[in-house]
Amino acid sequence: MLSLILFFPSFAFAATPVTPYYGPGHITFDWCGFGDSRSDCTNPQSPMSLDIPQQLCPKFSSKSSSSMFLSLHWNNHSSFVSYDYFNCGVEKVFYEGVNFSPRKQYSCWDEGVDGWIELKTRFYTKLYQMATTSRCIKLIQLQAPSSLPTLQAGVCRTNKQLPDNPRLALLSDTVPTSVQFVLPGSSGTTICTKHLVPFCYLNHGCFTTGGSCLPFGVSYVSDSFYYGYYDATPQIGSTESHDYVCDYLFMEPGTYNASTVGKFLVYPTKSYCMDTMNITVPVQAVQSIWSEQYASDDAIGQACKAPYCIFYNKTTPYTVTNGSDANHGDDEVRMMMQGLLRNSSCISPQGSTPLALYSTEMIYEPNYGSCPQFYKLFDTSGNENIDVISSSYFVATWVLLVVVVILIFVIISFFC
């Protein structure tokens, strides 16, 4: 009997390999997701169209045919489906982005399709960086500036739908002009301590009017903030070339001037409002691509980099054996998303570990984003790569187990 009792403590001290579950995970119940039709239970093809377990739909802010990038720049239009994304959670999983890709073949001026994929990468880079210190992310409509001058709607040279945000409008003259816009400190019950705001313009300056060359500049300005673009490079007539370019700005609540020198006025109509939490938690992003029949891009992978983001790349093409169509119901992603069904012990690029062997300290830096190769239940000395933070819960569990075995032995001895 003594050997049986000694078995349990010796087992506890044995180093056991940890095999991560590849895919996103969460350590606490305070998590949320952002998605598209592959996580949208309101889609008529659901649940066959889902890449996530159906019971997780309430955890995701999702809209079929939409994306967070697309929704920031456009309103609902025949070519675009906009959605007011809104979700809150200390830990965040992003699985969207494919609805704006080379398949859409979008270009506004001379930047081309590749130029817009670069803008998509810039947007998601800033979104993921800002989201690490925010619990809530909410796309909001901004109040239109008052006392707008006479404006004519801008157009794309390609006859595509010009982005609605920011608004790019043609002035009736070239007198330097400013209008005020406000980034609010709250939206409903959501506190906005920061905003993700697009700043877009046509580059290379010098827009021609009546054969004359006019410089061009735009800016967002307040007493404590300035961001602008100015270019007077002459490009006249048929040689004149312009790219639609966007930068994505971290801006605080307040009143700003949108100013212009030249032909166009640019001001924002939407922003992603975010609050601020007192810890930094890297976000997780899953590769969002089409099946091989359509062109995809790697913007999500390029945007999601350590230390602010953990990227989960597919290892096979988008492949469906039991979905609603060739682009909904990928076998590999469905398997990857199973890790979201339960709390995990640690999160890393290699996956999550659904073992209750780690303390809640794993959500804080520098623990979040790493998992040990082995665990030892009691021993916390030595190499940090093979030991994890033990907790009194597990110590108590093993002590109780030993006590129960001893008690059973005593009872058996008493009746014998």
Swiss-Prot record:
Tree of life domain: Viruses
GO biological process: fusion of virus membrane with host plasma membrane
Bilayer topology annotation: Single-pass type I membrane protein
Transmembrane segments: 394-414
Glycosylation sites: N76, N257, N278, N313, N322, N343
GO CC annotations on file: host cell plasma membrane; membrane; viral envelope; virion membrane
Signal sequence annotation: 1-14
Keyword Transmembrane helix carried by entry: yes
GO molecular function: carbohydrate binding; host cell surface receptor binding; sialate 4-O-acetylesterase activity; sialate 9-O-acetylesterase activity; sialate O-acetylesterase activity
Compartment list: Virion membrane; Host cell membrane
Virion surface topological domain residue ranges: 15-393
Region (Esterase domain second part): 264-379
Family membership noted in the UniProt record: Belongs to the influenza type C/coronaviruses hemagglutinin-esterase family.
Stated role: Structural protein that makes short spikes at the surface of the virus. Contains receptor binding and receptor-destroying activities. Mediates de-O-acetylation of N-acetyl-9-di-O-acetylneuraminic acid, which is probably the receptor determinant recognized by the virus on the surface of erythrocytes and susceptible cells. Also hydrolyzes 5-N-acetyl-4-O-acetylneuraminic acid and N-acetyl-9-O-acetylneuraminic acid, but displays a substrate preference for N-acetyl-9-di-O-acetylneuraminic acid.
The protein's name: Hemagglutinin-esterase
